[in-house]
From Swiss-Prot:
Catalytic residues as annotated in Swiss-Prot or TrEMBL: S107 (nucleophile), H132
InterPro entries: ClpP (IPR001907), ClpP/crotonase-like_dom_sf (IPR029045), ClpP/TepA (IPR023562), ClpP_His_AS (IPR033135), ClpP_Ser_AS (IPR018215)
Keywords: Cytoplasm, Hydrolase, Protease, Serine protease
Name of the protein in question: ATP-dependent Clp protease proteolytic subunit
Record-linked PROSITE patterns: CLP_PROTEASE_HIS, CLP_PROTEASE_SER
Gene name as annotated: clpP
Species in which this protein is naturally found: Shewanella frigidimarina (strain NCIMB 400)
EC number(s) reported in the record: 3.4.21.92
Gene3D superfamilies: 2-enoyl-CoA Hydratase, Chain A, domain 1
Quaternary organization: Fourteen ClpP subunits assemble into 2 heptameric rings which stack back to back to give a disk-like structure with a central cavity, resembling the structure of eukaryotic proteasomes.
Reactions catalysed, as given in the entry: Hydrolysis of proteins to small peptides in the presence of ATP and magnesium. alpha-casein is the usual test substrate. In the absence of ATP, only oligopeptides shorter than five residues are hydrolyzed (such as succinyl-Leu-Tyr-|-NHMec, and Leu-Tyr-Leu-|-Tyr-Trp, in which cleavage of the -Tyr-|-Leu- and -Tyr-|-Trp bonds also occurs)
Family: Belongs to the peptidase S14 family.
Cystines in this chain: none
Length: 203
């Protein structure tokens, strides 16, 4: 099955119409939710998506530096460098970033979920979380392959240390558990320390 063209997907984005003193104003649903400080991180983590997320985080900080931002995540993961651009911005800005997993947060998606403000990281009941070591592949001369292998091992160690800090798990446990794809239910993600609570309703 082929992915729908972007123009078709854009046409399917719902519009919200609001009455203002100057008349009616329409927003696409994501822009309207951005006014409520809600950001969606959905799909593959890559450079273009990361730039959009970073821009929204910086914009909301400039609007109200003391109000929380809500980052909803449904992602299979993706690029480490793109993910780290989002992560570093989350840590850099003044507002707390509350993370919510809906659907799945895998690989870099899980890392960003864990990187939310402590006490404000959540999973919806039927969401899934998956952690593992970074993936890499490179072709070329043996010396270049060795350089890239060393870089990937360095990234792996750095991510493991950061995940240990965010979850409270010992580093050796993180190293063991990320050695292969490690899937968790929402409840298990709470127990592991990737998130702080399970959200079943707004109440």
């Amino acid at each position: 099955m082929h992915n729908a063209p972007e123009s078709v997907l854009n046409a399917l984005v719902p519009m919200v119409v609001e009455q203002t003193a100057k008349g009616e104003r329409s927003y696409d649903i994501y822009s309207r939710l951005l006014k409520e400080r809600v950001i969606f991180l959905v799909g593959q983590v890559e450079e273009h998506m990361a730039n959009l997320i970073v821009a929204q985080l910086l914009f909301l900080e400039s609007e109200s530096p003391d109000k929380d931002i809500y980052l909803y995540i449904n992602s299979p993961g993706g690029s480490v460098t793109a993910g780290m651009a989002i992560y570093d911005t989350m840590q850099f800005i003044k507002p707390n970033v509350s993370t919510v997993c809906m659907g799945q947060a895998a690989s870099m998606g899980a890392f960003l979920l864990a990187g939310g403000a402590k006490g404000k990281r959540h999973c919806l009941p039927n969401s899934r979380v998956m952690i593992h070591q970074p993936l890499g592949g490179f072709q070329g001369q043996a010396s270049d392959i060795a350089i890239h292998a060393k870089e990937i091992l360095g990234i792996k160690n750095k991510l493991n240390q950061m995940l240990a800090e965010h979850t409270g798990q010992p580093l050796d446990i993180i190293e063991r558990d990320t050695d292969r794809d490690n899937f968790m239910s929402a409840t298990q993600a709470v127990e592991y320390g990737i998130v702080d609570s399970l959200l079943t309703s707004r109440g």
